[in-house]
From Swiss-Prot:
Residues with N-acetylserine modification: 2
Membrane topology: Peripheral membrane protein
Post-translational modification N6-acetyllysine, affected residues: 11
Keyword check for Acetylation: yes
Region annotated Disordered, chain positions: 128-147
Lineage, uppermost ranks: Eukaryota, Metazoa, Chordata, Craniata, Vertebrata
GO terms under biological process: actin crosslink formation; actin filament bundle assembly; actin filament polymerization; cellular response to oxidative stress; cellular response to type II interferon; inflammatory response; negative regulation of smooth muscle cell chemotaxis; negative regulation of smooth muscle cell proliferation
Name of the protein in its database record: Allograft inflammatory factor 1
The organism of origin for this protein: Macaca mulatta (Rhesus macaque)
Binding site for Ca(2+) 1: 58, 60, 62, 64
Record-level Gene Ontology MF annotations: actin filament binding; calcium ion binding
Assembly: Homodimer (Potential). Monomer. Interacts with LCP1.
Localization in the cell: Cytoplasm, Cytoskeleton; Cell projection, Ruffle membrane; Cell projection, Phagocytic cup
Chain positions found as Phosphoserine: 39
């Protein structure tokens, strides 16, 4: 058995998350200074919330969310997607490779006016949602509406 075993895995993970948080704070500062997003209400709290969510699903701390992390994120949000849908979503959001997307891509997606990924999620949600049947007595019909 090795004598040089590192028993501080939690400490190393904490340092990794602290470094990641510093990097994301720098990116948040860039978005706060960007005039494109200056009209957004409560931008600081939105960015903080997005940072927390991003850190929750960027488990390896490399700064990118891959397809499996996105799948887990959407499942946790109650919007599970197929592998093909996820690939399309990442392709639309990603500014670089088609396999992952970065934190700035994530912020542009979330802060954009009805972004592509949000539109796709809403579209799939509408398709999945069944029309509710009206309850109560049927509405009265006029003679002209009868067959």
């Amino acid at each position: 058995m090795s004598q040089t075993r590192d028993l501080q895995g939690g400490k190393a993970f904490g340092l990794l998350k602290a470094q990641q948080e510093e990097r994301l704070d720098e990116i948040n500062k860039q978005f706060l200074d960007d005039p494109k997003y200056s009209s957004d209400e409560d931008l600081l709290s939105k960015l903080e919330g997005f940072k927390e969510k991003y850190m929750e699903f960027d488990l390896n701390g490399n700064g990118d969310i891959d397809i499996m992390s996105l799948k887990r994120m959407l499942e946790k949000l109650g919007v599970p997607k197929t592998h093909l849908e996820l690939k399309k979503l990442i392709g639309e959001v990603s500014s670089g490779s088609g396999e992952t997307f970065s934190y700035p891509d994530f912020l542009r997606m979330m802060l954009g006016k009805r972004s592509a990924i949000l539109k796709m999620i809403l579209m799939y949600e509408e398709k999945a949602r069944e029309k509710e049947k009206p309850t109560g007595p049927p509405a009265k019909k006029a003679i002209s509406e009868l067959p």
